[in-house]
Amino acid sequence: MGQKVNPTGLRVGIIRDWDAKWYAEKDFASNLHEDLRIRKYIESKLADASVSTVEIERAAKRVNISIHTAKPGMVIGKGGSEVEKLRKELNNLTGKRVHINIVEIKKPDLDAKLVGESIAEQLENRVAFRRAMKQAIQRTMRAGAKGIKVQVAGRLNGADMSRVERFSEGTVPLHTLRADIDYSWVEAHTTYGKLGVKTWIYRGEVLPAKKENSKGGK
């Protein structure tokens, strides 16, 4: 089962949290579509800023957005000009008060989405797929990962038939729920069509927080 299911979704509620933190009964569909518009807009606007995750929280007419990026300076801009411009654009997009929080990713080589995007960018620039994958694996392991698995699928090197190539190093325990595994899937747009790049990074074990016993540990 662990080999098939999305590793992030499998661990939600155990060691991972939701990327959207809000609840709505009647407006659920409209809020969900608004979330999708926000994420799509941020990803297109900050395509070169190495954005990994966008977390959205809602409270009444206020939307709190946390942008996890490896290049916070590019997102914030000189004197905060760029982030203020982005906030105003999201205000107009949603019709609500938007607050933006920038979270810096200290080790981008341990982030599955950023590693996958790096491989995809090299594939689009006609770098040999084996070289791109092996270099990414070496950088990730040097950054302190316990294991990594990378998979590229499609018309590799312009071959007539599509195929799947995988490389891995270290251990990636997909069945262990306390294992902190970061997963991503990105696309590379080449002259021969699209290539799918999947990345699994094992960053060590995380023990779930124990709930305090209301009876004083008895």
Curated annotation (Swiss-Prot):
GO BP: translation
Similarity annotation: Belongs to the universal ribosomal protein uS3 family.
Superkingdom of this protein's organism: Bacteria
InterPro entries cross-referenced by the UniProt entry: KH_dom (IPR004087), KH_dom-like_a/b (IPR015946), KH_dom_type_2 (IPR004044), KH_sf_prok-type (IPR009019), Ribosomal_S3_C_sf (IPR036419), Ribosomal_uS3_bac-typ (IPR005704), Ribosomal_uS3_C (IPR001351), Ribosomal_uS3_CS (IPR018280)
CDD domains named among the record's database cross-references: KH-II_30S_S3
Cited function: Binds the lower part of the 30S subunit head. Binds mRNA in the 70S ribosome, positioning it for translation.
Keywords noted in UniProt: Ribonucleoprotein, Ribosomal protein, RNA-binding, rRNA-binding
Organism of derivation: Ligilactobacillus salivarius (strain UCC118)
Molecular-function GO term, any one: structural constituent of ribosome
NCBIfam families from the UniProt entry: rpsC_bact
SMART domains with a match to the protein in the record: KH (SM00322)
Keyword rRNA-binding part of the UniProt annotation: yes
GO CC terms in record: cytosolic small ribosomal subunit
Keyword Glycoprotein annotated: no
Residue ranges occupied by any KH type-2 domain in the UniProt entry: 38-106
SUPFAM superfamilies tied to this protein: Prokaryotic type KH domain (KH-domain type II), Ribosomal protein S3 C-terminal domain
Protein name, entry field: Small ribosomal subunit protein uS3
Subunit composition and interactions: Part of the 30S ribosomal subunit. Forms a tight complex with proteins S10 and S14.
